[in-house]
Each structure stands twice: as structure tokens, then as C-alpha cells.
């Protein structure tokens, strides 16, 4: 038991230190000065079920669903100097069934050996059709939030908090350093995958969810409201595997250094019965205790 606890602590410390260094580097190299700003406002038509992409390096991203077949892009560039402001460009490609938004910088700002010299940031606010597919939303430094998109959502964030709510379709979210929260209004037949390296994962499901759920951590606990059994491994890690409401949507949760929380919504529905799919009800660490 003492060895297990010590190894967990060691792994968590190493990973936490590494990710904290990434955080310091990102914050130190990215401009937060808003001495110079420039606004961008454009609207683009998008067919039903069309695809939306966004690639941003530094700056918050807010995406909200609305009931129009068009994408509205509102952005604010900000920098500590006019030169850095002018270097950052907002590029948009639109083709009727897709809208792609990217922040572009000169090549020298993309290197680690003399680049990243206080680049400008861009804060985006996108209004997208409720049924649009968020095919690739990528952010390096800054918070990311997505509200009310009912179709596919694929998003990643390296350094910053991630929040997605009102989810209904296929979802794949990944984070390196920062807390992740995903809240489902309902589940479809499409899979759900949430992964993180350093930071907690909080998943909220409908109370009457029908799902097959798997969750695992290297260093960090697992909590769930549905009563599924969490297995604690001999040296490192915890895992959970079970069915809710007889099974359904495939849900995979993985975290290296941080907790996983599975909650049910306070929606007034009866809570789905849970069935544990881990055949061994005993913890690996309990077996260690028997051997001592």
C-alpha cells in the first residue's frame, strides 16, 4: 500500500511539473497586452450539417449555436505593438458546406529557437448553426467553450479550460493542461471520447442515460454518481467499466494526471440502473494486502 501510494505520488509529481512548465512557457511567450487591437466581423452561409473548423494559437474561443444557416465570425486581434498586431492574420475559407477559420503568423513566429516573440493574440466568438459539425476546433493557449451544438464536436486545447454543454452527438475532446467539462443534453448512438493529460475531467450525463462506460486514470481518482465500481490497480492507476440503463452509447474517458468525475444531471428523470463489467470485484491493491 505504501509503495503504491508513493509511486502514484511520484508519477503525479513528474507529470504535474512537466505540464506546469508547459503552462509557464505558453504564458510567458504569448502576448496578453491589449495596447493595440483590431476587430474582424464577417458572416458566411453554411448548409445544414455543414462543417466548421477553427485553428487558433493564442486567445479565447467561444462557440455558440444559433438557428441560422450561417456562421458569424467576430474576432478581436490584440498585441503589445503595432508590428505584432499586423503580423497576425485571420484567414477564412468558405465553400457553402464548410467554413474554416485560422490564425496565421509569419514563419519565424512558429519556431522555438528565437520565434514566439510576443505574438499577437486573437479572441474568437463564433455563432454557428445548431446542427453544424465542429470538425476540428484547435486551440493552443486560452479557454475554449462550446454551447448548444447538437451535431459532432471534435475539439482540442493544449493550455486552458475547456467547457462544452448542450451536447447531443458524437464528441471527441482532448486537453493537455486544463480542466475539461462536458455536459450532455442527450446521448446518440455515436461514440464519446474525452482525454486529458493534466487536469480533471467532469462528464455530466442525462439521469436516464443508456451507455457503456469505460474510464481510466494513471494518477487520479474516479468518482461516479451511478454507483459503478472503481478498481484500484496494484501500482498505478484506477479504472471503471460498466453499463448504464442496459448499455448504449460507447463512452471512453482517460486521464493521466487528474480526476475523472461522472455525474448525472438534475433533470428529474429516474437514474439509470448500473451494471459493473469488471469481473473482479476486488481491488488489485486488496490482493496485495492479502499477500503481505
What do these predicted ranges mean?
Residues 2-292:
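Intrinsically disordered, low-complexity terminal regions
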Amino acid at each position: 500500500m505504501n509503495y503504491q501510494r508513493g509511486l502514484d505520488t511520484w508519477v503525479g509529481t513528474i507529470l504535474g511539473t512537466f505540464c506546469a512548465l508547459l503552462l509557464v512557457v505558453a504564458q510567458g511567450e504569448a502576448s496578453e497586452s491589449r495596447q493595440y487591437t483590431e476587430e474582424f466581423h464577417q458572416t458566411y452561409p453554411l448548409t445544414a450539417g455543414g462543417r466548421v473548423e477553427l485553428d487558433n494559437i493564442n486567445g479565447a474561443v467561444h462557440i455558440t449555436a444559433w438557428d441560422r444557416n450561417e456562421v458569424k465570425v467576430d474576432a478581436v486581434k490584440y498585441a503589445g505593438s503595432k508590428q505584432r498586431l499586423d503580423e497576425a492574420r485571420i484567414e477564412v475559407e468558405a465553400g457553402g458546406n464548410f467554413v474554416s477559420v485560422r490564425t496565421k503568423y509569419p514563419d519565424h513566429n512558429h519556431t522555438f529557437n528565437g520565434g514566439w516573440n510576443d505574438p499577437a493574440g486573437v479572441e474568437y466568438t463564433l455563432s454557428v448553426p445548431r446542427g453544424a459539425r465542429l470538425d476540428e476546433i484547435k486551440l493552443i493557449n486560452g479557454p475554449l467553450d462550446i454551447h448548444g451544438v447538437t451535431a459532432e464536436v471534435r475539439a482540442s486545447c493544449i493550455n486552458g479550460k475547456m467547457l462544452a454543454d448542450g451536447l447531443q452527438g458524437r464528441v471527441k475532446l482532448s486537453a493537455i493542461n486544463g480542466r475539461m467539462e462536458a455536459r450532455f443534453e442527450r446521448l446518440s448512438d455515436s461514440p464519446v471520447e474525452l482525454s486529458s493529460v493534466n487536469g480533471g475531467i467532469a462528464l455530466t450525463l442525462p439521469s436516464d442515460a443508456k451507455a457503456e462506460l469505460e474510464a481510466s486514470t494513471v494518477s487520479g481518482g474516479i468518482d461516479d454518481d451511478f454507483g459503478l465500481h472503481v478498481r484500484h490497480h496494484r501500482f498505478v492507476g484506477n479504472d471503471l467499466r460498466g453499463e448504464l440503463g442496459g448499455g448504449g452509447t460507447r463512452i471512453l474517458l482517460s486521464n493521466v494526471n487528474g480526476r475523472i468525475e461522472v455525474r448525472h444531471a438534475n433533470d428529474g428523470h429516474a437514474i439509470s440502473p448500473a451494471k459493473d463489467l469488471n469481473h473482479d470485484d476486488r481491488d488489485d491493491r486488496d490482493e496485495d494486502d492479502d499477500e503481505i
